[in-house]
């Protein structure tokens, strides 16, 4: 993709990685693997990949701004927990669209925290993303408030999807701030470092030993997570948080195509 800016290339690769991750999250959940176990497996694979790469490159593991890196890990864990619940309880494209309210949240938070300007184009994208999310969730809202028989989905899952998007927006702003001084792999490393121990208590009593197919799906969740996280962090280094995350809207397209092909 030589005709695209480097930041756009990174963010599109990130969008593809996250879309494939969401697909295998959905497939793993369909096998009866608990959401938090999927999250822990993702964190374990990402932790190993990040650790090996950092050690091989001679890069210090813990970075310099440890407090902000830890906060990024915690907020990312919260965003992912909410997002995974939405992905496993809603159609893939619908969950993805809700998650992609996060560029709107990123733009607003970036304005207040990073002092990034919100131009007319960015503002238009915010309005359109909110309208899109409302259009998608309207049938469920209508169905919950009337006797009209429409296809409805869990309002809790919808609320969690929106909450996950808000937390993702906050995490992206933190990543942008960290990317000025920290190595991308160090930023990525802190997420599984926090998420793995944090997720274990939530699935310990209902742990499921996956079969071979489930094991492969879980490994792929972690691998595609790493692709998405690393390229997203690199893209954030080169572009403002609001503009960089706008490219991630392509994940909606990727998720829809993958959903049609693999999930009918």
PLM-predicted stretches and their roles:
Residues 1-10, 107-166, 180:
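Juxtamembrane helix-loop boundary signature in multi-pass membrane transporters
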Residues 6-13, 64-75, 118-131, 157, ...:
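Cytoplasmic-side transmembrane-helix entry/capping segments in multi-pass membrane proteins
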Residues 15-23, 51, 73, 77-81, ...:
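Hydrophobic/small/kink-forming positions within alpha-helical transmembrane segments
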Residues 20, 58-96, 135, 223-239:
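Specific transmembrane alpha-helical segments of multi-pass solute transporters/efflux pumps
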Residues 31-78, 167-171, 190-205:
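Transmembrane alpha-helices of multi-pass small-molecule transport proteins
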Residues 54, 58, 85, 103-127, ...:
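C-terminal transmembrane-helix exit sites in multi-pass transporters
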Residues 95-101, 178-194, 229-260:
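Helix-helix packing/entry segments at the starts of transmembrane helices
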Residues 143-207:
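Transmembrane alpha-helical segments that form core, pore/gating elements
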């Amino acid at each position: 993709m030589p005709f695209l800016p480097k930041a756009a290339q990174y963010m599109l690769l990130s969008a593809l990685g996250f879309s494939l991750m969401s697909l295998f999250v959905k497939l793993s959940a369909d096998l009866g693997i608990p959401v938090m176990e999927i999250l822990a497996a993702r964190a374990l694979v990402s932790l190993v990949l990040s650790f090996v790469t950092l050690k091989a490159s001679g890069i210090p593991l813990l970075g310099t701004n440890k407090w902000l890196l830890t906060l990024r890990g915690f907020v990312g864990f919260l965003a992912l927990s909410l997002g995974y619940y939405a992905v496993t309880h809603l159609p893939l494209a619908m969950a993805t669209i809700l998650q992609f309210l996060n560029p709107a949240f990123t733009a607003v938070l970036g304005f207040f925290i990073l002092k990034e300007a919100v131009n007319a184009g960015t503002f238009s994208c915010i309005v359109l993303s909110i309208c899109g999310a409302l259009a998608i969730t309207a049938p469920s809202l209508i169905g919950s408030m009337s006797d009209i028989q429409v296809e409805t989905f869990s309002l809790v899952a919808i609320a969690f999807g929106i909450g996950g998007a808000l937390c993702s927006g906050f995490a992206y702003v933190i990543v942008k701030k960290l990317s000025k001084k920290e190595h991308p792999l160090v930023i990525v490393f802190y997420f599984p470092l926090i998420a793995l121990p944090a997720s274990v208590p939530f699935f310990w009593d209902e742990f499921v030993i996956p079969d071979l197919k489930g094991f492969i799906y879980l490994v792929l969740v972690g691998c595609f997570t790493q692709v998405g996280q690393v390229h997203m962090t690199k893209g954030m280094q080169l572009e403002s948080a609001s503009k960089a995350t706008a490219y991630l809207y392509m994940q909606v397209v990727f998720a829809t195509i993958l959903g049609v092909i693999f999930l009918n």
